[in-house]
């Protein structure tokens, strides 16, 4: 495991880094689906989802309706936990450590400190070491990813642009993170000090990424994945799994699309399988071109 956090003793209330990252590792190669009801959670589980994300409104609805988006009602989260046997994640606002405390008390399996909700703190993210439950956080570049890992994140996902059905931002973020990791791998030790300063991340963590060529945690992709081909695209580009939000339950045939995206994520390098599972899925979500989203409404720009 990485050198970060080795100094933090494990207590009854704090899961060790090894355990938290190991839990995230078990989701590798899978699809995590946004669900708003226990019925949707069952559809996701039956389709082969490796986990579900419990929330009141999918990102497309949050985007359309506006207003302040907060943590979901505990009754909704508990209903989804009771409905399925796979891990259940839930979202807390950036910096809102009390929402995270509530989610931990509800016994969710992962907390997503998410830019999809309205940020609670525009300067600080949650201190994730203080929790026993593992956190997943979004990143648009390597510096952001390393800062979240420094704060205790056990899984990183690209932010993409949630609720659009446009995969281009997720692709850009994944390419950026992977290109920046490759760049570190070719640097000499003295150059890594400057790189750490530029990335605003600890030198030890930067040196570890330079040595391994990978993040010390699992890297998933989120934001705009709407079709089996989208899922296979990001997997071929080096993602270790996929989050699908609005793309499934905003489409014409959610059960079929969910199963197809799971199959395409597993067989991501087999075009014949992807072609087969892409047939007859009905209407995809309508979607919004990211270029048409004005800067103040871009969710990926939340987080620092």
UniProtKB/Swiss-Prot annotation:
CDD domains: pdxS. Its EC number is 4.3.3.6. PROSITE patterns: PDXS_SNZ_1, PDXS_SNZ_2. Keywords: Lyase, Pyridoxal phosphate, Schiff base. Pathway: Cofactor biosynthesis; pyridoxal 5'-phosphate biosynthesis. D-glyceraldehyde 3-phosphate binds at residue 175. The keyword Amino-acid biosynthesis does not apply. It catalyses: aldehydo-D-ribose 5-phosphate + D-glyceraldehyde 3-phosphate + L-glutamine = pyridoxal 5'-phosphate + L-glutamate + phosphate + 3 H2O + H(+). InterPro entries: Aldolase_TIM (IPR013785), PdxS/SNZ (IPR001852), PdxS/SNZ_N (IPR033755), RibuloseP-bd_barrel (IPR011060). GO terms for molecular function: pyridoxal 5'-phosphate synthase (glutamine hydrolysing) activity. It comes from the Bacteria. The keyword NADP does not apply. GO terms for biological process: amino acid metabolic process; pyridoxal phosphate biosynthetic process; pyridoxine biosynthetic process. D-ribose 5-phosphate binds at residues 34, 163, 224, 245-246. Catalyzes the formation of pyridoxal 5'-phosphate from ribose 5-phosphate (RBP), glyceraldehyde 3-phosphate (G3P) and ammonia. The ammonia is provided by the PdxT subunit. Can also use ribulose 5-phosphate and dihydroxyacetone phosphate as substrates, resulting from enzyme-catalyzed isomerization of RBP and G3P, respectively. This is Pyridoxal 5'-phosphate synthase subunit PdxS. It comes from Cutibacterium acnes (strain DSM 16379 / KPA171202).
